[in-house]
Amino acid sequence: MFSKLNLLCFFILILLFSCSKKNNDLSVLKKDNLENQMIEVYKQGIEEFEKGDVIYAGKKFSEAELLFPQSVWAPRAVLMSAYGYFTQGYYGYAINDLERFLVKYKYHPQIDYAYYL
């Protein structure tokens, strides 16, 4: 009985020590890095939009919004995506983006433009 109790305590100690170690392998994205990534993706979306590849640009704008939705660039990305889809005749995609903009950014200064589109 005594040896079983010692064995049980030993395994509990091993379990506790294995759980208490810091995991240094985790990669943590800082706010600055995430915002820089978001701006870079937004710029890629602008470049693709200027080249005429509206579908890929729309995907890049959506990716930019998902990366950092609190940024001032996020609502702009949604509007650019909707505008690109609208100009190329992809009205369903444009309406989806505009509805998402109207729900997420109710008090944005460019809300009138979203209603106009």
Regions found by a protein language model. Give the residues of each.
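Bacterial Sec signal peptide processing site at the extreme N-terminus
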Residues: F17-Q37
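Short solvent-exposed coil/turn linkers within tandem alpha-helical repeat scaffolds
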Residues: L67-A74, L102-D112
